[in-house]
Amino acid sequence: MTSFFDSDSSSNVAEYSVSELSGSIKRTLEQAFEHVRVRGEISGYRGPHSSGHAYFALKDDRARMEAVIWKGTFARLKLRPEEGMEVIATGRVTTFPGSSKYQIVIDSLEPAGAGALMALLEERKRKLAAEGLFDAARKRPLPFMPKVIGVVTSPTGAVIRDILHRIADRFPVHVVVWPVRVQGDGASEEVAAAIRGFNALEEGGPIPRPDVLIVARGGGSLEDLWGFNDEAVVRAVAASGIPLISAVGHETDWTLIDYASDQRAPTPTGAAEMAVPVKADLEAQVANLSARLQAAATRQMDHRRHALRALARALPSLDQLLALPRRRFDEAAAGLGRGLQMNTANKRRSFERIAAHLRPELLTTRIREQRRHLLEAINKAERCVERQIDRRQARVSAADASLRTLPSRLAGQIHRSSDRVSGLGRRADAAMAAEMRRLKGALAAQDRVLQSLSYRNVLQRGFALVRDAAGDPVKQAAAVTAGMALSLEFADGRVSAVAGEEGAPPPAAPKKRASRPVVPTKQGSLF
């Protein structure tokens, strides 16, 4: 009988400690499964830990595997883990010796198939819609005729060629292309950066700021177009201050930026058609509108012309309109001439009456000069009035000719001319009256001078004026001979006398006889 302790100590089976075996298993797993892709459903995910790491499990219908995403890796993930999401995890398998459990350290995550992508897409769509990024009120109309168009797409391929060709065919404008990758790693970041870059351009800068943006890509699978479902791209589209057209994929392909953009085009070519109108159509439309406008203007002019002719027929003739103003003007002109002549004649007669009483030779020359000045003033006034009348008549004749086309203005001008002629007549009368007053004043002054120089004032002081038989004044005693008949003129009358011899006694005084009345002389008062 063999004892339990009688074992063969020389057995070839190696002996390991627990730590040694756990370490050996760890190294074996890490070497054998250094880089693996595992497909499974995320289970037990509660979001990142306070440390920043994420812990959850991957499972299928028969097994379960623990998984971890370190903090640095989690920040770089394009796809965030979500509970129940089916994913393909890429990483390495390792164990934790302290608990003899193996797990996968994930380096990247991607959806497992179209179903998972669609589920993720719907979830993201609901989230962004709840924030109002897809609201119709946020969408802006596209400019009718942009000067600059910005295009965000790949610089190579058929998309950019189709857009440029279509714009050149319809309405050539300035196109600025921002080259980006439209698929693969970094595509979404480049598209979002391009949209923000176009919005950052300043008006009048070296690179013109676009009036409208086109984000375009050709068709492809859901995975190919996934970059345009990225949240950063959608937010950049929603925040764009420039109206944006999304043209990603074909008409049946929808991405999240289609909901956030201002307009969605079924194809890149359709986006170019939305961005610019057809120049030929615009020219035809302008020509049509111009023709319609010209026709409408012609019709309106014809209508106005017929209406004007009808109104003209209803108006009286030009001669009828001008008959009364002409007659009034002729009467005023004739009355003005007659009035001036009568006034001048009256003033002349009055002047002659006054001048007839001015006998002294001292004033004769002055009066004759004043009369000449007066006649010159009268003639000058008459010539001035005649010239005024001639000018007014010439103006009225010119107004008469012009008023054949402008009746209303001619009638007003004739009235104004009549008023002006009447005013000139009044001014002429006033000037004549003022001149006569001035001449009367001058004559009165001359009369006063004449009175002051008259010899009668000397006789009033007791002197006598001796005249010979011929009536001439005797100025010297030597001119008197004895027996000469003399006439002595005193202030109150005349006395006859005979001259005696020098030294003879004076004759006896004659008998007093009744004084005869004083004969008034021809020298009367001036007025």
UniProtKB/Swiss-Prot annotation:
One GO cellular component assignment for this chain's record is: cytoplasm
Chief subcellular location equals: cytoplasm
- CDD domains the record matches: ExoVII_LU_OBF (cd04489)
Its UniProt entry gives the catalysed reaction(s) as: Exonucleolytic cleavage in either 5'- to 3'- or 3'- to 5'-direction to yield nucleoside 5'-phosphates
Compartment(s) where it occurs, according to its Swiss-Prot or TrEMBL record: Cytoplasm
Please provide the record's keywords in A-Z order.
Cytoplasm, Exonuclease, Hydrolase, Nuclease
Q: What is the lineage of its organism?
A: Bacteria, Pseudomonadati, Pseudomonadota, Alphaproteobacteria, Hyphomicrobiales
Q: What is this protein called?
A: Exodeoxyribonuclease 7 large subunit
Identify the stretch(es) annotated as Disordered: 499-527
Among InterPro entries, the record links this protein to: Exonuc_VII_L, Exonuc_VII_lsu_C, OB-fold_nuc-bd_dom
What EC number(s) does this enzyme carry?
3.1.11.6
